């Protein structure tokens, strides 16, 4: 009886541990608003290649002379590599246009859709708002 109880407890613990990563990961609709598309033009401050999502930080100048610092969620490093990105694709100071969906809480955070470069080139940043997974 004692060993049977231990097996049940151990099995339950393993199932709970396996479910933790799934529960910790958010969905697009939980955090971002598909009706709040934003177009941001600014300069790259930093690109973080981290899991489960990369983060692009940009400074966006406003008409009143102030600057907003936005944090843009992108795909994981492996997704970025598949889409043609590398760690040198967005050096600090690069001028870009970002099409993204803003956070539901109104924070200066968004899930990326596309990045447009001054030469007109567009690339998908692989954010959770992307469903096609294709290069743009």
Language model segments and positions:
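Short aromatic-glycine-enriched beta-strand elements
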Residues: 50-61
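Bacterial N-terminal signal peptides that target proteins for export
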Residues: 1-12
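Conserved hydrophobic positions within beta-strands
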Residues: 42-44
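OB-fold/S1-family single-stranded nucleic acid-binding modules
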Residues: 103-127
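Short, structured beta-strand/loop micro-motifs enriched in basic residues and often containing a Trp
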Residues: 74-82
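Short boundary/loop segments of OB/S1/cold-shock single-stranded nucleic-acid-binding domains
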Residues: 23-38
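Short nucleic-acid-contacting surface segments enriched for D/E, G, S/T with interspersed K/R
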Residues: 82-98
